[in-house]
Amino acid sequence: MPNRLIPLANPANRVLQLDAKLLDNEISDMLYRQLSGAFNSNRLPSWLGRIHSNYASELKLLLELLIFKVTVWNKHSSYGLTLQNLVMYDGGVHNKKFRSKQQSELRVTKKILLLSSVLLGYFVKKIQSYVYSFEDYDLETDGEDLSTLERIRLKTIKLLKSQISTLEKAHSVLSLVNFVTFLVSGSFPDLTTRILNIRFKPLVTTQVAFASNPETISYEFQNRQLVWNTLTEFIVFILPALSVPKFTKSLVSSITGTSPKSSQVTDEDLKVFSSLPERVCAICFQNSQNSDSGAQNDISLNDTLVTNPYETTCGHIYCYVCILSKLQIFKEEGKNLPKSDPNKYWHCLRCNEPASWCRVYTGDVEDALRQKAVEEVTEDEDASSEDEEKRDQDSEGAKTVSQSFHHVNGSDYQTASFIEQAELNENEYTDGSEVEIYDAEDEYTDEEVDDDSPGFFVGAL
C-alpha cells in the first residue's frame, strides 16, 4: 500500500509538472500583454483601442485558443511541458493492443474535452460578471409593473448569485484535496487532468535531459519550497471559509455563558447616534467610543467622517467598509433565523430600523454633508432679519415722537431757532463793527409787547 502511494523507484517528478503549469500561465500572460500593447498603440487608429477595451475577454479567449491549437492540438504538449521534456498521453486506455500507440498521443475526444474546458472557463467568468453586476435591491420582484418573464429572470439571477459563492468554495475545496493527492501520488496536478484521466511522461527517452534526470539534480531546495507553498495555499484556501466574527462571538458566549447581544439599538445609544451630524459615520463613532472605553468627550468628530458613502434601506449614510462588514456578518449569522426574528438583520444606529441591503449613494455627497449647515445659516439669517426689522420700527417711532413734540411746542422751536441765528450774526460781525443789543421794552414803550414774543433781538450799527 505505501509503495503504491509513494513509489520509491523512479518517482514521478512533481516539480516538473508544476513548473510546466506555471510556464504556460506566464507565456499566456506575456502574449496577452503584448497584444494589449499593440491595440493601445498611439500609431494605430483609436477604434482599435475601443475594440480592446470592449472585447478584452474575447481577445484573450482567441489568444488561448490559438495557443491551444499550436501546442496541445498539434503536438500533444504545451509549451511549458515541452520545456520540461514532458508530453501528455491518455491514461484511460486499458487495451494492450492500442496501449503503446495511444500512450504517445491524445485521442481526439480528449482534445475536444480540453478545448471545452477552455471555453467553459470563459463562460463561467462571463456569467459571474453578469450576475455580480446586479445589486440586491435590483433583484426585488415585488414590483407590480414587472412581467412574468422579468420576474423569472430576476429570480434566476438571484438564485445564481446565492449559489455562485457556494460553488466557488466547493471548487476550492476539491482543488485543495486534488493538490494534496497530487503531492502524494505524483499524478494529475489539477482537476481537469484528473477528470479526463490525462497523464504525463518524458518526451524523449533515448537521451538524458538535464531537466528530467532526477539522479543528477538535488531537489532538496525545491522540495522545501514546495512544502512552504503548500502551506501557504492551504491557508489561502481555508481562511475564506472561516467566519472570524461568528467564531469569536460563539467562543465568548460559551466562555461567559451569556446569550448573544441583540442587534437592536438601545434608547440611550439611539439618542446619542441620532444627534450626530450627517457627515459623521455612526459605526465609526461607535467603534471609537468602544475603543476609548466610553470616553465620548475625547472623541473627535473629524476622525469619524463618512468615507465612500453608501445608503442603507432606511436612507441613512455610512462608510462602505463599515456598513458592508455589518451586513455581511448578520447575513451569515441570520441564515437559519426566521424573518420575524429581530436579530436576523442589522439595525440602523440612527433610527433602529432593520437594514437588509446597501447601495451607492447616488445623490450629491456634499448635499448630505452640508444640509445641516445650510439649515443653521438659514436660521441665523432669519433671526438677523427680524432684529433689523425691530430696529427700524424703533427708529420710526422715535422720529414720530420728535415731530409731534416740535409741532405742539412751536414757540419753543422758533425761539431756539432765533437764538441760533443771533449767535451766527454775532460771530459774523466780530471783525470790528459795533454790536449793540437793544431791549425791546426800552425801544418800544408805546407799543404793547406780546408775552409770547421773543424778549430781545440783535441789530448791527
Swiss-Prot record:
Entries under Pfam families matching the protein: Pex2_Pex12 (PF04757)
Metabolic or biological pathway, per its Swiss-Prot or TrEMBL entry: Protein modification; protein ubiquitination
Known EC number: 2.3.2.36
Region of interest (Disordered), residue spans: 374-408, 440-461
Keywords attached to this entry: Membrane, Metal-binding, Peroxisome, Peroxisome biogenesis, Protein transport, Transferase, Transmembrane, Transmembrane helix, Transport, Ubl conjugation pathway, Zinc, Zinc-finger
Molecular function GO labels: transferase activity; zinc ion binding
InterPro entries named in the record: PEX2/10, Pex_N, Znf_RING, Znf_RING/FYVE/PHD, Znf_RING_CS
TM spans (from-to): 14-40, 52-77, 102-139, 152-185, 219-242
Catalytic function, reaction form: [E2 ubiquitin-conjugating enzyme]-S-ubiquitinyl-L-cysteine + [acceptor protein]-L-cysteine = [E2 ubiquitin-conjugating enzyme]-L-cysteine + [acceptor protein]-S-ubiquitinyl-L-cysteine
GO biological process: peroxisome organization; protein import into peroxisome matrix, receptor recycling; protein ubiquitination
Domain of life: Eukaryota
Binding site for Zn(2+) 2: 314, 316, 348, 351
Residue ranges annotated as Cytoplasmic topological domain: 41-51, 140-151, 243-461
A GO cellular component annotation in the UniProt record: peroxisomal membrane
Entry's free-text remark on domains: The three subunits of the retrotranslocation channel (PEX2, PEX10 and PEX12) coassemble in the membrane into a channel with an open 10 Angstrom pore. The RING-type zinc-fingers that catalyze PEX5 or PEX20 receptor ubiquitination are positioned above the pore on the cytosolic side of the complex.
Protein function: E3 ubiquitin-protein ligase component of the peroxisomal translocation complex. The two types of peroxisomal matrix targeting signals, PTS1 and PTS2, are first recognized in the cytosol by their receptors PEX5 and PEX7, respectively, which then carry the cargo to the peroxisomal membrane. The peroxisomal targeting signal (PTS) receptor-cargo complexes interact with peroxisomal membrane protein (PMP) components of the docking complex.
Quaternary organization: Component of the peroxisomal translocation complex, composed of at least PEX3, PEX2, PEX10 and PEX12.
Family named by the database record: Belongs to the pex2/pex10/pex12 family.
Protein name: Peroxisomal biogenesis factor 2
Organism this protein belongs to: Komagataella pastoris
Gene assigned in the entry: PEX2
